[in-house]
Each structure stands twice: as structure tokens, then as C-alpha cells.
Amino acid sequence: MSEILQDVQRKLVFPIDFPSQRKTEKFQQLSLMIGALVACILGFAQQSLKVLLTAYGISCVITLICVLPAYPWYNKQKLRWAQPKIEINVDQYD
């Protein structure tokens, strides 16, 4: 079974489209972790779950504003398409 999965894995190539997407994902994870940490500290200091959830919600919205739009610096490096390893003859299906 392992050999079958390795064969399928060699034939299927799913790279991340842009190297900038890696940076964006790392930025997203880092900002959400910092937001969660700050929210926990604020919530603990105020002894309020409402403050914690509000602070985390604000950090999520800020992260969305920074990460979600297609800013030009996300597309600085051009996309290299993966070349298919399997050739399909579409003429035989006509």
C-alpha cells in the first residue's frame, strides 16, 4: 500500500502557487498568535472574558485586512506551473 501512495505522490504535484504565499501564511499565523497572547493578557488583567474575546476579534479583523486582499507585493514572484507527468490523449475520446 505504501508503494502505491508513493507512486501517486510522485505523479501529483501540489506546490504552493507563489513563494509570497508562504510569507503571507507565516505572517497570518504570527499575527494571530500575537493577537491571542495580547488578548489573553488583557482578559486576565481585566478579569473579563468579554475583553478577551473583543481583543481577539479585533486582532482577527486586523489580520484579515492585512492578509486577505491581493496586494501587489504578494505577486512579485511569478508563478511557475507544475508540468504534468501523465500524458492524456484527448483525441481518443472523440
Curated annotation (Swiss-Prot):
Ribosomal protein keyword on record: no
Modification N-acetylserine, positions: S2
Lumenal side: 50
One of the protein's GO biological processes: signal peptide processing
Record key words, sorted: Acetylation, Endoplasmic reticulum, Membrane, Transmembrane, Transmembrane helix
Major localisation: endoplasmic reticulum
Record topological domains on the Cytoplasmic side: 2-28, 72-94
Origin superkingdom: Eukaryota
Residue stretches spanning the membrane: 29-49, 51-71
UniProt-annotated location(s): Endoplasmic reticulum membrane
Assembly and interaction partners: Component of the signal peptidase complex (SPC) composed of a catalytic subunit SEC11 and three accessory subunits SPC1, SPC2 and SPC3. The complex induces a local thinning of the ER membrane which is used to measure the length of the signal peptide (SP) h-region of protein substrates. This ensures the selectivity of the complex towards h-regions shorter than 18-20 amino acids. SPC associates with the translocon complex. Interacts with SBH1 and SEB2/SBH2.
Role noted for this protein: Component of the signal peptidase complex (SPC) which catalyzes the cleavage of N-terminal signal sequences from nascent proteins as they are translocated into the lumen of the endoplasmic reticulum. Dispensable for SPC enzymatic activity.
PANTHER family named among the record's database cross-references: MICROSOMAL SIGNAL PEPTIDASE 12 KDA SUBUNIT, SIGNAL PEPTIDASE COMPLEX SUBUNIT 1
Miscellaneous note of the record: Present with 5550 molecules/cell in log phase SD medium.
Protein name (record): Signal peptidase complex subunit 1
Species assigned in the record: Saccharomyces cerevisiae (strain ATCC 204508 / S288c) (Baker's yeast)
Source taxonomy: Eukaryota, Fungi, Dikarya, Ascomycota, Saccharomycotina
